[in-house]
């Protein structure tokens, strides 16, 4: 539901809460949340991460814009659960307390301007994914996206950049067919 329709605007004007599906599910569910957004690649990344996590843990839920509503699984979640959630800009508009342990913004390119009206507003809404994250949380950002590279310099959660085209001083990058994690102290091959 667009947040600028008269009914929703009147709720905001009256100080009434306006929760979307993601906010309701987050408040109802348990466990840690890994949330993925971006203009392109969300579904593929969410499915891949969901598979990796499902192979490593017992209680994993892959939900959100990927097709399974977050709310449909929220009551099944336990403290030990991991939720991998694909989150769209539309879903981010109505978050209030939603706070993923790890967030990722894959990229931001011009899209949904019929809803967000300007590129600046679209970027602002995408960046809401870190709104409630703390310094104990992580945000994974695409180093090749100039908007995200700059955004990462000014956010509360720990920033981890990734790149498929260059070696990074710190972050995750491709080196030939090798995925490498480089920290200040070491270089760790992750997948070959």
Language model region names:
Residues 1-35:
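Short, basic phosphate-binding NTP loop
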Residues 50-55, 72-76, 153:
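Short, well-ordered alpha-helices that flank and scaffold nucleotide-derived cofactor binding pockets
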């Amino acid at each position: 539901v667009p947040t600028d329709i008269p009914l929703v605007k009147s709720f905001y004007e009256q100080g009434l809460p306006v929760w979307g599906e993601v906010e309701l599910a987050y408040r109802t569910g348990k466990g840690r949340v890994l949330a993925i957004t971006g203009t392109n690649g969300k579904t593929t990344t969410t499915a891949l991460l969901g598979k990796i996590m499902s192979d490593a843990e017992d209680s994993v839920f892959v939900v959100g814009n990927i097709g399974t509503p977050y709310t449909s699984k929220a009551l099944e979640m336990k403290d030990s659960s991991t939720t991998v959630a694909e989150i769209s800009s539309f879903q981010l508009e109505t978050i209030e307390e939603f706070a993923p342990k790890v967030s990722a913004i894959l990229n931001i390119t011009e899209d949904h301007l019929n809803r967000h009206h300007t590129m600046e507003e679209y970027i602002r809404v995408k960046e809401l994914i870190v709104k409630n994250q703390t310094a104990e949380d992580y945000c994974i950002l695409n180093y090749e996206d100039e908007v995200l590279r700059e955004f990462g310099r000014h956010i509360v959660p720990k920033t981890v950049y990734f790149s498929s085209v260059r070696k990074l001083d710190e972050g995750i990058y491709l080196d030939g067919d090798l995925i490498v994690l480089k920290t200040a102290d070491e270089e760790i091959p992750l997948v070959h």
